[in-house]
Amino acid sequence: MKAFSKILCPVDFSPCSRLTAHYARQLAQACASQLIFLHVKPVVTEIYETMVPELAAYVSRNDQSLNEVFNDFAGDWAGKHEKIIAGGLPHEEILRLAEQTQADVIVMGAKGLSRVERYLLGGTTEKVVRRARCAVLTVHDGDPHLPAENILFPTDLSDYAHRTWPLVAELARLFKAKVHVAHIIDLPQLRHQRPRDESMSNFGHKLKVAVREQLQETFASSGVDHEIVVVEKQRGIGPGLTELVDTLHTDLIVMPAHGKNPLAPPFIGGVTERVVRMAHCPVLTVRHHQ
């Protein structure tokens, strides 16, 4: 199994986008993949050009300048790659090109020219993550790098989540990485108990033991270096996972695009959305089709 054969990397020339392009080149080199850089420019309505004739000449000069910036931005990477400039709405063009080129994964920044976009629903990245049929790898500011040494694979114990495992295992073998298979036990009943009920504490302990045993059995013959991590968090699953990222020195998170119910609208206040927004490392979300 080859992790990724074709990688689509949208760029808007922001600092985060430059980091993303570098990460995409590293991934393409590791996977021997074709890399497609995409820049989506705003479209000037034709009727405006007829009203102000000089506008058409300005757009033409701007396109030439854009090509020069794009060539510099893509770097001198010698691998198989392509540069595409399209016009339109960014998320629509990214999704269209992903389908048209049959990309296996879209690698894009957590935020673009707007530094607050990552905290708002409706940003380009979140629209792409919601709607893309292929995997989406979201890169955050900081020091994203490959090869990854520690991969975090969160699971809700469902068969749907475990369909992501073959890709996780392939990436672990590719990077010679260790995988932390993690499950967060979230018992909402514990959050509002004052004082804490000891019987609920016992239930939590028994659940941790049972979940650990189930995961150990499930991944016993995985063939990759892995560790089972089961923790109980009262703050919720999303915050619990982002805490694990720091504790486990995670370089890459790989998780399904939604949880136990694949028919539910993904990323509307869900766990995966919170992780994509707030994690300090790249997050690869994978959607499985029935």
List the predicted regions and their residue ranges.
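Structural beta-alpha unit
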Residues: 1-2, 23, 53-57, 72-106, ...
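General small-molecule cofactor/ligand-binding pocket signal
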Residues: 36-38, 82-86, 137, 180-182, ...
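Short beta->alpha linker loops
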Residues: 65, 85-89, 143, 185, ...
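Small/aliphatic-rich secondary-structure junction motif
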Residues: 1-54, 150-201, 220-224, 278, ...
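A short acidic, glycine-rich active-site loop
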Residues: 54-68, 199-211
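Active-site phosphate/pyrophosphate- and oxyanion-stabilizing loops and adjacent acidic/basic residues
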Residues: 25, 71, 126, 169, ...
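Gly/Ser-rich helix-loop-strand patches that form or flank binding pockets
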Residues: 3, 26, 30, 95-144, ...
